[in-house]
Structures are given as structure tokens and as C-alpha cells.
Amino acid sequence: MYDSHQILASVDAHITLFLALGTVTMLFNYGFFITAIINGNRDRAFPFALFACTLWFAHDISYLLMFHTWFGTYHHWYLELFWAALIPTSAIEAIYIFQVWRFGKDELMPKSSQAAFNFYVLAAVLAGLLGWFSVKSFLADPIYVYTFGCTGFLGVVTAIPRLLRRRDAAGQSVAMWLCFIFMQTGWFSTTALLFGPVFQTPLWFALWFGCVAGGIFMVAASRKLKPAPTLAPRGLPQT
């Protein structure tokens, strides 16, 4: 457990460094997210596992719903700025879920009806929301420092097995995963430099290493493997 007020005091004491690292991190975050949408539409394949999409969406929505906490209880510019930054990411994560629905039936439930697949996607979203809010109630992470790092790790550890199973790079690209590496490095660097000894532990650094190593693997795989043509979504012609 960390002291959130000590972290916010450190942010204020090192505001130039924090803004520099934070700006770079968020730029790569948006680069990673937007590139993934482009890749998914290009290849007609959802870029992220539904499990990851639903938890990301639930994570960011939960932060947005805590408006009074950030603007009332804490009333600190960093937490308020993060709130604003998560509005577009939440919208993008909703697009990811839509891409799973639009492109994913033939991969995930090829023998099922469209109605059954619709129910599956909706149930996954509800399960993600329920699961996240349940877990969050037990986490000692009041200002979402730990979970921002972990949710990134979730993206790469669910992407690797899916890529190996498909044996193609549909929905992926070198640029996308380079953005991921720099995004995660920016966040973990910020926490290690400014957020105190809780974020200077071997376990935290191991999580950072796992993100970077996984990102490097995805860069190499995206370069080597070509996006194989996938079945068109229902009602759309294959090109």
C-alpha cells in the first residue's frame, strides 16, 4: 500500500519531469490505441482479446465514475488530468469491443448463431465490469498507479498466445507494439522515479521487464508474420 498524498506531493515537487514523462507516455498510449483500431479495420480482425478489452473498458470507466473523488476529495490536477485523458481511451476500448463483435464470430464461435455470439459479447462485457469492480474493491490502489501498469501487461500477455494460435499478425503491426513498449516504459519510469520505494521493488521491475519483453516479441512477430486474410464480417464482402 502506498501513500497517495505522498505521491501527489512528489508530483508537485517534480512537476517538469512528471509532465515530460506523462506527456510522452500518453502520446504513445494514444498511438498504441489508435494504431490498433486502424490495424483491426485494415485486416478485418479484432486486435485484442475480448477478455483484455472488457477489463480495460471496465478499468477506465470505473476511474471516470469516480469524478467526485478526483475533483472533490483529492482535487489534484494530476488526477483530474488523468480523468480527462481516460475519456477518449474509454471510447476507444468500446470500439475494440465493437471490433470483436464485428470481426470475431468466425474466429471465436464459428458454429454458433449470430444471436448466440451477440449474447456472448454482451455477457463478456458485463462479466468484465462485474469482475473489475469486485477486484477493485479489494485492491489497495486508491489512485490507480498499480493497475495502470498491470492493465498494459494484460494486453501483451493475451496478445502473444492469440498470435501464436492464429500464426498470423492480423490486427497487429510493428508501429503499434513499438508504441506499447514506449508507453509502458514511460509509465514504469515515472513510477520508479517519482512515486517512492513501493514502485522500486523487484516485482514491479519484473512486471516492467515482462511488458517490454512481450512488446519486443510482438514487434518481431508482427514484422515476420503477415496479416493473413480473415473471413469478412457478416454482410460485408471479402476483399
Segments (PLM) and residue ranges:
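Alpha-helical membrane-protein topology signature
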Residues: M1-T239
